[in-house]
């Protein structure tokens, strides 16, 4: 916040708000003694810098109080307040020497500030002489654009709005001007603007650390937020409130941005297209993340284990593994989750909601990724290909499991029998052999199963559903593995080879049966 050199000071010295941090009474009460001391030091430093440049009138009572370390609270008026001593008197004109960076010598800025409680505005007109180090500051009074003429309360003088255009005509920036969105400062080069903006970034970071505390805390899970609106959105996770409803399908959302995103599913709009592979996305941020697949960029790194990620959301999810934090708890079964999305997906188990429906066969799913994987059954798409053996897979999880066949990796070991598995779900399924647990029950015949996939396959006996169809002979199957085995009849593929005699088979069961002959020969 401190004024570092004159050009920045002139732009930021028209109203109190431009050089001060303002607090409401409630916000002031939330600050710790250390934060109030920081506030006082920053304000006094700003005032001292402005005094040294000769741009201020008599010292206001406010700063006398601050110097004496008296408790002070800014006035809380609807339109804010403007201090007369912060600007030059209309009759006075001064020339001030200043040290100006070389790259800024050919720049000038006109900056206007408005008082929200009045119809007139005051502007500081800054004339920056090219190649020199002299600055002329003149106070001018202009009328509100919506009124033909209005008297300024400070000087009593009246001007038409045309005066502004007349006086500022000679000060138009070049076509290649780059303006800072934070303070309005103009630069002739984008590289200079980027350097300048780092000052704001550092200031904003410091303000967040010292002043902008996360004051809005959720009573349910203790998570804190900078803004009350963010807390309100977060609390809807706990309450289940979804005030934004889609008129097309009736689906409801907790935030309006999610509804806007969802509506593009109905329209089919995907305006953001990858220029490398042509893949299109609903959101620009998704395209940015996708681009990193091509570039290999992973800018978000875990400071504990150094693992890197394509997007911040994946890093946040990963960091919860280290912290063990699971703030989202299901009121139905007590299960807790480290992500709100996982929590919402879990709740659909209890509600039975399956909002993602296949337009080919009508099958519905709880999560969109399951629908995407399912649709590949119809399209035959297998985007995940193994570099070792050339085998392709419909989903990434199956591909990841397959790769462990080549590496021999089995990191998940049973604590009861020491048997090892390639993935955690296989271990969980195996452990149910020891416990006898069968948590998945058929709602038609009440037969129970130890894993969900077995229940899904069983239900097809009742429904007679055969979703896996051969494209060559149209024969259909209940299981995808049965279709894969059947297709080898057409292709002649025999991937299972006997290591004793070299004979090959199209099914593992046939290979096992064959190997028994070798054992019998011995």
From Swiss-Prot:
GO terms for biological process: regulation of transcription by RNA polymerase II. A zinc finger (C2H2-type) spans 178-200, 216-238, 244-266, 272-294, 300-322, 328-350, 356-378, 384-406, 412-434, 440-462, 468-490, 496-518. This is Zinc finger protein 454. GO terms for molecular function: DNA-binding transcription factor activity, RNA polymerase II-specific; RNA polymerase II cis-regulatory region sequence-specific DNA binding; sequence-specific double-stranded DNA binding; zinc ion binding. It comes from the Eukaryota. Residues 14-84 form the KRAB domain. It is found in: Nucleus. Its main location: nucleus. The gene is ZNF454. Belongs to the krueppel C2H2-type zinc-finger protein family. May be involved in transcriptional regulation. The keyword Cytoplasm does not apply. SUPFAM superfamilies: beta-beta-alpha zinc fingers (SSF57667), KRAB domain (Kruppel-associated box) (SSF109640). One of its GO terms (cellular component) is nucleus. Residues 147-170 are annotated as: Disordered. Keywords: DNA-binding, Metal-binding, Nucleus, Repeat, Transcription, Transcription regulation, Zinc, Zinc-finger.
